Amino acid sequence: MAGLYSLGVSVFSDQGGRKYMEDVTQIVVEPEPAAEDKPAPVPRRALGLPATPTLAGVGPSEKGPAAARDPAPDAAASLPAGRCCRRRSSVAFFAVCDGHGGREAAQFAREHLWGFIKKQKGFTSSEPAKVCAAIRKGFLACHLAMWKKLAEWPKTMTGLPSTSGTTASVVIIRGMKMYVAHVGDSGVVLGIQDDPKDDFVRAVEVTQDHKPELPKERERIEGLGGSVMNKSGVNRVVWKRPRLTHSGPVRRSTVIDQIPFLAVARALGDLWSYDFFSGKFVVSPEPDTSVHTLDPRKHKYIILGSDGLWNMVPPQDAISMCQDQEEKKYLMGEQGQSCAKMLVNRALGRWRQRMLRADNTSAIVICISPEVDNQGNFTNEDELFLNLTDSPTYNSQETCVMTSSPSSTPPIKSPEEDAWPRLSSKDHIPALVRSNAFSEKFLEVPAEIARGNIQTVVMTSKDSETLEENCPKALTLRIHDSLNNTLSVGLIPTNSTNTIMDQKNLKMSTPGQMKAQEVERTPPANFKRTLEESNSGPLMKKHRRNGLSRSSGAQASSLPTASQRRHSVKLTLRRRLRGQRKMGNPLLHQHRKTVCVC
């Protein structure tokens, strides 16, 4: 019955609304390896051996028909030893892996799981029990191989080894047999049409999710010393780890933190769950396996999907959607999107309807047709058509198609795009030096200014706007002339939108006037004062005595005169009176000093 059907395969994946894409899919089609149990009989003449010797009582007449039944020597001589005379068909491998805690485990399973399975002893056997045992051994071998790669995987934010793991749902089609193996919550659904006269195709769940709350899984976990804890309505396997502040060997007195960690009871990877007392993994890598005999007249669809699909689309709805899509394609001639892409888009739409952040969603849809396609094996943009009897070969290395769906996370901004504006002026801009206005030492003056050669720098409006973007607050650069003591230049950029370097922004004053301005400076309007300060009258900044006379002896000759000091005192008194007038009615004035008796 082999060769009486063809397969139409479509695959699609979407990141959803998650920050990382951890779903991977894999499709491999390659010639079936030779059987181990019953090797094909090869004629002795083809191997260059003499014919069967004549036994006693066996005449030439009995030997002749036996020799006549052998194939022609020249026809079989071209075949190598141990090979069957008939053409071998191909075996198809399909896998969906949903990673967690990082993409490393899912990527490793996609690249190596099929290789570990097919090299196990008994996989090419004709007995289904031996094939299932070989598949289980392949899962365990892949899991142990991850242990050797653990040191190469990136560590967690706390510096611990990687906690990466993955679910795995595998379908292997060889001849008329379909082998299913899975760990985790990625499921496989089979569409069966019971009555050929009835168009209804019912959905059969081939796999059962490995959840920690299942009695069988909970009993196994607790038997290994683990536990299951409910967190936010979800049952999770508990990770028992020493407290992060602990260093050294783990003893009985070591504080152990119990963290509800993983929502599946079986997975590949998750090496953190190894129990040293029992020598087993609390999160088991051993898969559940099953065997199904395909009947092209009854079995119509095989769907592999991650939990992002099955959490939103029930199995029966998924089968009905695929059936409707195929009817539109073949009966009405509409060449729309593939079944896998349609299912993923429907799932993403339901995530949005429920106002939830969509999970990574992946699907592989296999449509079984009872008629062999005369077009042979070919692929198009969305689908792959296979006839396994023609020994096709296919290997999908990049089947995870990243799409820009409405639920997808926007791409990360490239590092070349600098969000901060940069100055593009060709003129030389002096470095900004921060100093205290009342420090004992003034800024060093450039030689050009010391000689009295002060050049005015003209900036364009474009450069000034760029400078204002980097200087949102008013910035004052004061250059004190410690040699001539004649001028003090202040460069004051403002926050106005149309700012240019004009005479208003370039202020020149004598050292005496600069000192008076520093003394008379008042706080801004939004400055908060305490109760004691408000009761003691207007606020005045106290300046240090002889703050400007400590620099050098050459500066003593240019100190302000007595008349200038009296003028500054008058300005200070005016400021005080002006502040008192703003307080309003004198009857409402508060006392300068208030004593509270409790």
From Swiss-Prot:
Induction data: By p53.
Feature: compositional bias, Low complexity: 65-74
Residues bearing the modification Phosphoserine: S78
Primary location recorded for the protein, binned into one broad class: nucleus
PPM-type phosphatase domain segment(s): 57-368
Reactions this protein catalyses: O-phospho-L-seryl-[protein] + H2O = L-seryl-[protein] + phosphate; O-phospho-L-threonyl-[protein] + H2O = L-threonyl-[protein] + phosphate
Family: Belongs to the PP2C family.
Function: Involved in the negative regulation of p53 expression. Required for the relief of p53-dependent checkpoint mediated cell cycle arrest. Binds to and dephosphorylates 'Ser-15' of TP53 and 'Ser-345' of CHEK1 which contributes to the functional inactivation of these proteins. Mediates MAPK14 dephosphorylation and inactivation. Is also an important regulator of global heterochromatin silencing and critical in maintaining genome integrity.
Keyword Chloroplast: no
Name this polypeptide is given: Protein phosphatase 1D
Principal EC category: hydrolase
Gene: Ppm1d
Cofactor stoichiometry and binding remark: Binds 2 magnesium or manganese ions per subunit.
Residue ranges, annotated region (Interaction with CHEK1): 1-94
Subunit structure, interactors included: Interacts with CHEK1 and CHEK2; dephosphorylates them. Interacts with MAPK14.
Subcellular location, record wording: Nucleus; Cytoplasm, Cytosol
GO cellular component, one term: cytosol
Bias type Polar residues, positions: 548-563
Source species of the chain: Mus musculus (Mouse)
GO molecular function, one term: metal ion binding
Keywords in alphabetical order: Cell cycle, Cytoplasm, Hydrolase, Magnesium, Manganese, Metal-binding, Nucleus, Phosphoprotein, Protein phosphatase
